[in-house]
């Protein structure tokens, strides 16, 4: 809720459990009896929290670790300034995709600026306060780009160690956002994982 064209309910307070519930509600509404959940960054925390028995697999792409992701208090005013300064979110998104940006990158910046006002600081606070409530027991693929300025390799290793059936795939020369930097590689990785969990 509150991203892209999805409205946020009045009084919405960002939290990982609230986002996870919204994802589960969506899957039920579209009649998806089984799903492979793919989560990037904050979405990795959401997918981790949303995974349940009917989940066939989990792919975590430079995801926030199950122990949460603290943001230093001094950074919160900077996050709040993104609401007024168009260049600030653009610079932040550029840092998250250091090797390549798609032609539609300006549209991504526009979309980011339409985010619900509660999200600017709220998402960082949600990640700081979140701890995974349980470890999903099915197959998990943890993807980590070595140029990520936000998620460290140690965090990615801790994420993989948290799940009983996880493996870590390290991607050299990729930053935080493989989905932007090399979507073809991500597609191939996802197709391979889908074949594994379908077999």
Question: Which residue stretches match the model-derived regions?
Answer:
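Catalytic active-site module of serine/aspartate enzymes centered on a nucleophile-bearing elbow/loop
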Residues: 166-199
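Flexible "cap/lid" loop of the alpha/beta hydrolase fold
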Residues: 45-85
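Conserved catalytic-core motifs of eukaryotic protein kinase domains, centered on the activation segment
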Residues: 6-12, 70-72, 153-154
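Alpha/beta-hydrolase active-site loop signature
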Residues: 1-4, 65, 175-178
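Conserved serine/cysteine hydrolase catalytic core
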Residues: 121-161, 170
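Catalytic nucleophile loop
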Residues: 39, 43-44
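Conserved alpha/beta-hydrolase catalytic His-Asp/Glu region
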Residues: 69-74, 83-135
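Active-site loop/oxyanion-hole signature of alpha/beta-hydrolase fold enzymes
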Residues: 2-38, 188
């Amino acid at each position: 809720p509150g991203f892209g064209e999805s409205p946020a309910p009045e009084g919405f307070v960002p939290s990982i459990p609230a986002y996870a519930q919204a994802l589960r509600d969506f899957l039920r509404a579209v009649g998806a009896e089984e799903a492979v959940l793919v989560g990037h960054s904050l979405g990795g925390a959401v997918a981790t929290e949303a995974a349940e028995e009917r989940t066939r697999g989990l792919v975590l792409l430079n995801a926030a670790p199950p122990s949460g992701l603290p943001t230093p208090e001094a950074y919160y005013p900077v996050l709040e300034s993104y609401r007024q300064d168009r260049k600030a979110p653009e610079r932040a998104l550029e840092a998250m995709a250091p090797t390549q940006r798609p032609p539609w990158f300006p549209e991504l910046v526009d979309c980011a600026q339409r985010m619900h006002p509660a999200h600017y600081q709220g998402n960082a606070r949600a990640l700081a306060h979140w701890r995974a409530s349980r470890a999903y027991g099915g197959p998990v693929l943890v993807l980590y780009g070595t140029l990520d300025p936000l998620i460290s390799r140690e965090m990615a290793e801790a994420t993989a160690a948290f799940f009983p059936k996880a493996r870590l795939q390290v991607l050299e020369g990729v930053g935080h956002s493989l989905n932007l930097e090399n979507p073809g590689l991500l597609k191939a990785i996802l197709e391979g994982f889908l074949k594994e969990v379908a077999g």
